[in-house]
Design a protein with these regions (language model features):
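Glycine-rich catalytic cores of cysteine/serine-nucleophile enzymes that process amide/ester linkages
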Residues: 1-48
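Activation targets extended, charge/polar-rich intrinsically disordered C-terminal tails
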Residues: 67-146
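Residues in flexible loops and secondary-structure boundaries
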Residues: 18, 60-65, 118
Length: 146
């Protein structure tokens, strides 16, 4: 999720499709809390958890990343972590993110930042954790990368 002048979800090689979604080139537009909730639910199952890692950034950094994501285009299957790590490495303050094809390695590299906040969602229902996450989402600074 990039929260800049507009809030989008970059879903590289993503499979989340619905007729009501505004999607172009693996970018889901209008990432309001309902869409974010649906996105988390879509990717979280009894054998897969979803971890959200957040870093607050300046408006300039968020806008720069947003523009690069929008111009990136659709990503081939199996290149999701590679595309995210490449885009982050081009972002001021994120140059030390490891280049990788592996989502777990990307998550570990991102977690090495001192300013990362993280929450993990499991199924079937993380109601309390989700309520706390959305309360926090409403209080955090406007510009960030999740």
């Amino acid at each position: 999720i990039v929260n800049a002048s507009e809030r989008v979800i970059f879903d590289p090689a993503g499979s989340m499709k619905h007729e009501s979604l505004a999607e172009r080139g693996d970018v889901l537009y209008g990432a309001n809390p309902a869409l974010v909730d649906s996105f988390i639910d879509y990717h979280t199952r009894s054998d897969f958890y979803t971890q959200v890692q957040t870093v607050d950034v300046s408006l300039q950094v968020a806008e720069d990343l947003l523009e690069r994501i929008k111009s990136n285009g659709a990503v081939y299957q199996s290149f999701c972590a590679q595309s995210v790590s490449r885009l982050l490495r081009q972002t001021p303050g994120f140059e030390n993110i490891s280049a990788t094809f592996f989502p777990g390695k990307l998550s570990e590299s991102f977690a090495n930042r001192a300013d990362v906040r993280a929450v993990t969602f499991y199924q079937p229902d993380d109601t309390n954790k989700r309520a706390n996450f959305y309360a926090w989402l409403g209080q955090k600074p406007m510009f960030n990368i999740e």
